[in-house]
Amino acid sequence: MILVRNIRLPLSAAEPQAFEKALHTLRVPRSKVEHTGVAKLSVDARHGQPKLVYTVAVTLKQPGEEAAFVARCPDAALHSRADFTLHAGTQPLVHRPVVCGLGPAGLFAALLLARNGYHPIVLERGPALADRVAAVQKFEQTGALDPNANIQFGEGGAGTFSDGKLTTRIGDPLCDNVLEILAAHGAPADIVKKAKPHVGTDILKDVVREMRREIIKNGGEVRFRTPLTGVSVKNGALCAVQADGQDIACERAVLAIGHSARDTF
């Protein structure tokens, strides 16, 4: 696939115009093109008349020809979709993996594990969203703080009560997969294209719930109000974690505890 960047058009322009300009910029005949699509879209309002700025994805019928067209176009680059496959290890797990924390990292880790048949156990120190929202509202109204159910802790993590902007500066190609998963669980479909994707807090709560439901549907288990309290190591390897006064045997654990769980640190 080729990405053609910096396709600038008036606000009134439609996607087909962006595709045509991208092919013209790339100097590739339409007859060689298998598919065109919008990879990213933003608005540049910095200088005078605002412009739409597209990044257009172009797939040729003969992928082997793509490098030659890219070489003569400074605004073009080759792009391959990141592999979002969870690769199995060489040794079978005796016990289910444990994911500690149900914020963004824990949600996606548990979702991938569940989709691949690992039946993860998720430990979340806070409550499910409905109870968490009630606790936050109570705090706002009365000042009564539940240390495990608040803006920081609970299903969805701290970002659940932000304004829903999805911001990253890492440029990781896996970001596209993350946006697609969010859209598949109820986020606006256009976040996969927008340069500044925005879900919105009201929608984000529903997205988080739907992701949790898929985890459970695929054999995962979510234990709310169950903080990680300890780990057990034998012969240099993890053998169990402690939570809710019991040992949970496991060989693998994902510590997705965020930055505010000081007692866990």
Identify the residue ranges that each predicted region occupies.
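Residues forming the flavin
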Residues: 1-50, 56-265
